[in-house]
Amino acid sequence: VKAGFDGSSLEMVLHGAAPCPPAVKRSLIEWWGPKITEYYGSTEASVITLINSEEWLAKGGSVGKALPNMEIIVVDNDGQRCGPNAEGTLYFRSLMGMDFEYHNAPSKTAEAHLEPGVYTTGDVGYLDDEGYLWLSDRKIDMIISGGVNIYPAEIEGVLGGHPMVADVAVIGVPNEEFGEEVKAIVVPNDGVTGDDDLVGILAAHCRENLAGFKCPRSFDFADELPRTGTGKVQKRKLREPYWEGRERSI
């Protein structure tokens, strides 16, 4: 495939919205050169961080440092600021004084704000000693199994890096003993059959690369994953069939 394309005129590739599997991104940098810049942001806050190819190769998995006009604040469950490498809810402040409110939704606006001008979009992560931001996941997607918090993004990163996987989403499904358990919904690569053999291969891959409690208890296969217009996986749609008839809301 590579031989059929001349990338000499390519100057920069900017990507965001959802993480790119590390193995895929590394191969693209090897192919195109250090021309890929990743951003992290939101509709509410616009662009918050940037990381170029050289930085990413040294800090693989980070989404970069805050732009000069943005401040990142990490807050624990008690509302206290976290130090370096301590995980918490991410809040942001525009140093230009910009803020937002949700249209006709004052309670939602209030819930999103720690104080005037300091807001969250529900992401969880941490800042390292050098100020690079690392995302864990969105709170809304977090799986709580037996009282333990499990973030799907880490599991998706491991499975997404397997050569037999084209796409993957990890969700929490009902478990009578633990409340939730981890399920992976996998889109197999072209020419790969989603069967028990593939389940065994992927389960072994997870055991080699993840803590035991993070490994999926089950796998389902799909032709494609439901996505929004901006490419984000619609996990609520994926969870709905498994939680139908349950008292818990998803």
Predicted segments, located by residue:
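Beta-strand->loop->alpha-helix junctions that form or flank phosphate-binding loops
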Residues: 37-43, 64-66, 171-174, 220
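Acidic/polar alpha-helix N-cap and adjacent early helical turns
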Residues: 240-250
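Short, P/G- and charge-enriched loop/turn segments at secondary-structure junctions
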Residues: 56-63, 111
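Gly/Ser/Thr-rich phosphate-binding loop
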Residues: 1-58, 71, 78-80
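Core-facing hydrophobic residues within beta-strands of well-ordered domains
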Residues: 7-10, 67, 165, 216
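AMP-binding/adenylate-forming catalytic core of the ANL superfamily
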Residues: 94, 100, 108-116, 122-214, ...
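Active-site glycine-centered loops adjacent to acidic/histidine catalytic or metal-binding residues
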Residues: 17, 41, 64, 123, ...
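Conserved ATP/PPi-binding loop(s) of AMP-dependent carboxylate-activating enzymes
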Residues: 65-69, 80-112, 150
